[in-house]
């Protein structure tokens, strides 16, 4: 018919059905066909609007053009209503209730043996080196994306072996022969796992696979009721490989994204199970994608007084980086919080549980991660080492940035600890214990209180030997007690009376039980001999004053 013919509802309906069918086919082939109205809202509106307008134009029908325009207008209105312009409180509440607590009340004290000294970049190199030890295997596969996780209380980077090409996938139809584990605390602990319980591993469901074993397609075919993101390769406590895939829905009307659970797929067999957040297996470390949490934190901080807060009153924003930290075997996202307009000054930091998304705010003024990195690099500027992004730790109730210092080849050369509250309080060493000892000395010499720690110990005894050491202008007395192999280091900043101590004096020492070193940093020192002398001198002075008063 000329110019499309006469418009009819039946003909229009055919256009609509064909357009939706075409859209469904396209989305299906892209593994994005989701049976959820809120997530698929845009995919519903676009075909309807375009089809209505095109049909109206080709059939000279204003009502269909108007209908298409009205649907676009409806979409715009709904998006505005769901945007922060109107629903700023709903956007700010995406993060949930943010609890404010003291740093020392929840963060576990440092355990040097569990402190991650290997970052992802170095772990990648170690994994590639391990794979390269088997030339025949290295030509068939490559190491996938490494993810940090806790396995039976120990931190490892884990990644599957991926097919290196389509041809390799065809020839290795049973799957790749295992996965790689790289310890985050010991660079000598790198494992290529090809067997489990005496049985060979065959990882079939991978991002590098094709057709029905392609990971994205496999997830889509097993769950079309929610959108998927954050495909994470994780091991259960027995070392069995799985894919943990975040399921999400819309968070505010038809906008934003909110994690609702996970689809867990056996990487070998393809068997799957859908879990809500509340009934997730304990071995799963992460459900909440880091970009979701970053977005929530920024909305929570910037929308404190709505969108039209042009004076930036009380506005907060997260710092550039985000890191994973483990506390009591729970996984958290860490990020610093700054005031808008003050990029280098920290007002606190947040820890967000990577499973349930619960966030805790720790208010403390201090330095940002970037400022701490520059401070650590400044200590060894002659070597031009670069600092890795900091890992937040608790050293004697003091929030502390820990980082490694690497050379131009990416090799770890030093370790650094920087106090969050004062980034000038920094220590650098060539071993973890040496760095910790230096850091504790610096804390003591800067009069930062280290009392009240749950790892504090007390010892009493008689001095056997005492010696003086000058470190960076500070007087440090090393004391050995009888029948005690430890060496107790006492700064004159901690106790002036230590300079009067001598062998044979009875002393009481409080110290931090941190690490395995024989040399121990003391945070409280009492000498019974000098203290008793001080008391006698005080009594004599009081008696003299009283006599003078009587005379008057």
List each language-model region with its residue ranges.
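Soluble extracytoplasmic regions of secretory-pathway and membrane proteins
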Residues: 3-552
């Amino acid at each position: 018919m000329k110019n499309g013919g006469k418009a009819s509802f039946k003909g229009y309906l055919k256009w609509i059905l064909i357009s939706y069918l075409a859209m469904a086919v396209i989305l299906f082939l892209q593994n994005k066909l989701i049976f959820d109205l809120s997530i698929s809202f845009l995919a519903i509106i676009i075909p309807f609007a375009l089809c209505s307008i095109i049909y109206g134009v080709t059939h000279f029908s204003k009502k269909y053009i108007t209908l298409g325009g009205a649907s676009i207008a409806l979409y715009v209105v709904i998006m505005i209503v769901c945007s922060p312009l109107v629903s700023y409180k709903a956007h700010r509440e995406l993060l949930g209730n943010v609890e404010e607590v003291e740093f020392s009340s929840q963060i576990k004290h440092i355990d040097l043996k569990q402190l991650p000294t290997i970052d992802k970049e170095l772990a990648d190199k170690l994994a590639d080196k391990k794979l390269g030890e088997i030339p025949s295997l290295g030509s068939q596969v490559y190491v996938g994306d490494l993810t940090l996780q806790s396995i039976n209380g120990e931190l490892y980077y884990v990644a599957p072996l991926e097919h290196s090409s389509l041809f390799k996938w065809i020839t290795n139809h049973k799957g790749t022969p295992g996965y790689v584990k790289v310890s985050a605390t010991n660079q000598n602990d790198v494992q290529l796992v090809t067997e489990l319980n005496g049985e060979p591993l065959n990882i079939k469901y991978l991002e590098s696979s094709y057709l029905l074993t392609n990971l994205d397609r496999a997830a889509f075919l097993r769950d079309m009721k929610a959108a998927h993101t954050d495909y994470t390769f994780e091991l259960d406590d027995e070392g069995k490989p799985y894919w943990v895939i975040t399921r999400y829905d819309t968070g505010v009307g038809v906008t934003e994204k909110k994690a609702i659970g996970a689809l867990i797929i056996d990487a070998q067999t393809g068997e799957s199970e859908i879990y809500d957040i509340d009934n997730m297996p304990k071995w799963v470390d992460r459900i909440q994608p880091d970009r979701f949490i970053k977005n929530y934190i920024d909305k929570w901080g910037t929308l404190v007084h709505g969108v039209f807060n042009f004076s930036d009153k009380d506005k907060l924003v997260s710092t550039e980086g985000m890191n994973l930290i483990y506390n009591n075997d729970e996984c958290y996202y860490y990020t610093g919080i700054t005031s808008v307009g003050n990029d280098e000054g920290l007002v606190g930091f947040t820890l967000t549980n990577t499973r349930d998304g619960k966030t805790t705010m720790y208010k403390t003024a201090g330095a940002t991660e970037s400022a701490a990195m520059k401070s650590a690099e400044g200590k060894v500027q002659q070597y031009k080492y670069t600092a890795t992004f900091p890992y937040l730790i608790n050293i004697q109730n003091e929030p502390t940035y820990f980082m490694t210092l690497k050379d131009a080849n990416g090799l770890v050369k030093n370790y650094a600890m920087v106090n969050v509250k004062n980034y000038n309080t920094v220590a650098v060493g060539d071993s973890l214990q040496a760095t910790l000892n230096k850091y504790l000395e610096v804390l003591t010499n800067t009069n930062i209180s280290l009392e009240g720690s749950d790892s504090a110990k007390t010892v009493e005894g008689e001095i056997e030997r005492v010696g003086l050491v000058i470190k960076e202008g500070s007087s440090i007395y090393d004391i050995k007690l009888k029948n005690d192999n430890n060496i107790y280091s006492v700064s004159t900043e901690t106790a002036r009376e230590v300079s009067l101590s001598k062998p044979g004096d009875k002393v009481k020492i409080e110290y931090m039980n941190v690490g395995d070193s024989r040399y121990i940093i003391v945070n409280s020192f009492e000498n019974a001999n000098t203290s008793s002398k001080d008391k006698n001198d005080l009594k004599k002075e009081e008696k003299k004053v009283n006599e003078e008063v009587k005379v008057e």
